[in-house]
């Protein structure tokens, strides 16, 4: 059974919290499907080319149909002409969204949480609050844990803590309601307040 290390104010391990046993039974394919859907949902969809109806000009037939000895042409804007349109190019009206069921989203989160805990990269603390709002105080938390980057999960976000972590490229702060499987899996470590962790587990 996966156990979460509970840390004190000095970030020393004091106790452990067990995740529900069912988390260990979740198939990894649920995480794959959710991450695939999440990334598709945030895709920029900016690639766009002009078709024959979008390119200006080319309305006049460039030369007569017969008698020149050359190939016939009806427009100078077909895809075989320089300055012409693109055939079968990408359009920015495409919808890349992929549906994932609510149950599957939950299973993906459970797998991601269990994976972090199993690898000793999930930590629980009573409170994460940077009252000074200073980045150096926020950075010291990450340095004490000795991790490359971290997802910080608070039960309720406060302005000072958000300000302190905002300038750190290797940290991301969210409240418990915003947690998803992608964020948990993409960061090398997760630090959560006990109340936030209870809220996440309770939702399942």
Swiss-Prot record:
Give the keywords, sorted.
Answer: Ribonucleoprotein, Ribosomal protein, RNA-binding, rRNA-binding
Task: Tell me the GO BP annotations in alphabetical order.
Answer: translation
Task: Region Disordered: list its residue ranges.
Answer: 48-75
Asked if Signal is a keyword of the record, the answer is: no
State the similarity comment.
Belongs to the universal ribosomal protein uL4 family.
Known partners and oligomeric status: Part of the 50S ribosomal subunit.
What's the protein called, per UniProt? Large ribosomal subunit protein uL4
* UniProt organism field: Campylobacter fetus subsp. fetus (strain 82-40)
Primary gene name: rplD
